[in-house]
Amino acid sequence: TLNGAAVERNLRAFELGRWAVLHPEDAKRVMTPNVVALPKTLDEKIAFRKDHLTAYQGKGLAKRYGAMLDKITDDRLKEAVALGYHKLLSYKDEYEVARLLKSTRAKVAEAFEGDPKMTFNLAPPIMSKAGADGRPMKRTFGAWMEGPFNILARMKFLRGTPFDPFGRTEERRMERSLITQYEADMKDVLPKLTDATHDAIVALAELPLQIRGFGPVKQANEAKAAKRREELLAVIRSGGTQSSRAAE
């Protein structure tokens, strides 16, 4: 096995099985399917993302998101922007991780009796070294981290400000610059929307969905997306006269 990964998984599976035998009622609650109705219509998808941005940062960010979408009447393009713009605006930083973990803790408390303890596998940017694959190595933190996480989740108002202690990292600066760039691109290309440029503009609007991952992985995907962005902008600015394959 690679670094004992399979052994660790087997041990976890064994512990999980033993826990299920000792706590059958809790196991039953956890294994009961939790069916969530996903948004289906475009309006539902937009409303869902507005709610998420409000929880992520506040009403101001949701309003900023909505203002962009209000400028678009073409449904296909509007959905592309709804997805792409939302992904950029809601980059997963330390404050969002803390908020999500706080939410997870509340769900765990509902699912289990007593006072279950949680451990966290994290790779804090200011504390983590790169592994052999170039990715930050994760460290295990105990339940004592719940207190700091609760505080951190309430400090999201610092996000993107000069007082943000995490905002100076290369990844955070990149994420903020991508938002500014996207807004400028949409302002540039929306007036150029025609039948000939439509597919290229939709592809440009959806491009942020390709920037996945964290750390070196995200940076590599961003570099690929940057190259693709230049290709699409060239098609759009030429009136869609270049090879149609550039927008596929």
What are these regions, as identified by a protein language model?
Residues 2-248:
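Active-site loops and adjacent core secondary-structure elements that bind or stabilize anionic groups
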